[in-house]
Amino acid sequence: MVCIISFISISTSYANIIENFNFKNITIEDGLSQSTVKTIYQDSKGYIWVGTYAGLNRYNVYEFKQYKHDEYNKNSISHNYIIDITEDKNGHIWVSTISGLTRIDTDKDEIKNYYSEKDNCNLLDSNRWRLLTTKEGKLIVFGINGVNLYDEEKDTFNSIALKENNLNTAVIYSEEEDSNGHIWVGTDKGLVELDKNLNLIKSYEDTIGEVEV
């Protein structure tokens, strides 16, 4: 009887919570650049950033501002196919695309793009960059060919050698920092745990693959 009453109580409370949610469908008719959403991120100012296969969108609850690549405009994003989004400690928005990385200064409305090693920014070549800003303010870029750490003073990237783990050849699906500052990386080869200095703690193999955290 106690179990049944508890279950009913929990179910009723859950139903009441659900009733308090309001849902709204947002489409291209509302200003979204494309209907296939790849990633969503909320910044410190409350803006919702939406990455699609056809451009980047910033939403302020009322309207969208679109960011698209323009080969004739240096103040445009590196590509329209968006992979991931994060915000650094200075409030700049970083966006990874299949072509490069983009940094957006929303206060000045300035954009700077970073490409692979051929552009002298030391960014390892990849078309699936994943981004993470740690609690200490480090900007880490995970790619298929390795890991990069952003050097703010030099405005460039340093390649991090990760020994005895499978990140250097893995496809990275997701990454997350825990309360201890450890970084968990989900890959097609399993789960990898790193310390805050990106040293390997442990690898967890997955026979199925495509681990997300």
At which residue positions do the language-model features occur?
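Carboxylate-rich, polar loop motifs that coordinate divalent cations or form catalytic acidic clusters
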Residues: M1-V213
